[in-house]
């Protein structure tokens, strides 16, 4: 490995990587990093100014550490005002919901549907009860085997008894 003095045209040959370029780029990278930090701090300062509503004389005296401390306090206030359902530490490790929780999660969206269907279900149940009452009333009032409905040939008695009753009805006429 040959070593040269670092100048604009001289390069140390070490696998095609220039040590001189790395050394020269380091201050430039540091300058860019500091510029990003200062830009972010000024943005934080503007956010805090809008939130704090303090006069501009005090704003110019804020140090970088003050800005960071106030930003942390501000974020903590926001977090306490609006608690998250899952904290970052528990979001990756989640336990499966219990059956009661699953049922609760299912019931909540079904409540509007149930309130919509409830009157219709009540009407349907009332209709079924009326139909049963009507059928029982007909059976109670017609024990002799008279057809339950005019359009149906169904009788309450055996077919032999029904035939016998038909013959008796014809003889009366």
Curated annotation (Swiss-Prot):
Knockout or disruption consequences: RNAi-mediated knockdown leads to an increase in seam (stem) cell number variability.
Gene Ontology MF terms in the entry: DNA-binding transcription factor activity, RNA polymerase II-specific; protein dimerization activity; RNA polymerase II cis-regulatory region sequence-specific DNA binding
Classification via InterPro entries: bHLH_dom, HES_HEY, HLH_DNA-bd_sf
Gene Ontology biological-process entries: anterior/posterior pattern specification; epidermal cell fate specification; negative regulation of gene expression; nematode male tail tip morphogenesis; regulation of neurogenesis
Residue ranges, annotated region (Helix-loop-helix motif): 35-78
Subcellular location: Nucleus
One term under GO cellular component: nucleus
Disordered: region residues: 83-102
Presence of keyword rRNA-binding: no
Signal peptide (UniProt feature, chain positions): none
SMART domains reported in the protein's UniProt record: HLH (SM00353)
Job of this protein: Probable transcription factor. During development, required for cell fate specification, probably by promoting or repressing expression of genes involved in specific cell fate. Involved in specifying lineages derived from the epidermal stem cells of the lateral ectoderm, known as seam cells. Modulates symmetric divisions of seam cells, perhaps in concert with the Wnt signaling pathway. May repress expression of homeobox genes mab-5, egl-5 and lin-39.
Name assigned to this protein: Helix-loop-helix protein lin-22
Species, as recorded: Caenorhabditis elegans
Gene name of this polypeptide: lin-22
């Amino acid at each position: 490995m040959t070593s040269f003095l670092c100048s604009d045209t001289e390069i140390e040959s070490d696998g095609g990587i220039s040590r001189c370029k790395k050394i020269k780029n380091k201050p430039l990278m540091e300058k860019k990093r500091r510029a990003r930090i200062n830009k972010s701090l000024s943005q934080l300062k503007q956010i805090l100014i809008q939130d704090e509503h303090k006069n501009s004389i005090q704003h110019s005296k804020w140090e970088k550490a003050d800005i960071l401390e106030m930003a942390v306090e501000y974020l903590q206030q926001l977090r306490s005002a609006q608690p998250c359902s899952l904290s970052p530490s528990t979001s990756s490790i989640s336990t499966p919901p219990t059956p009661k929780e699953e049922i609760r999660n299912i019931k909540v969206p079904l409540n509007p549907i149930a309130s919509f269907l409830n009157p219709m279900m009540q009407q349907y149940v009332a209709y079924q009860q009326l139909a049963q009452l009507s059928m029982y009333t007909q059976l109670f009032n017609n024990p002799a085997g008279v057809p339950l409905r005019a359009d149906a040939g169904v009788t309450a008695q055996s077919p032999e008894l029904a035939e016998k009753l038909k013959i008796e009805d014809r003889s009366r006429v």
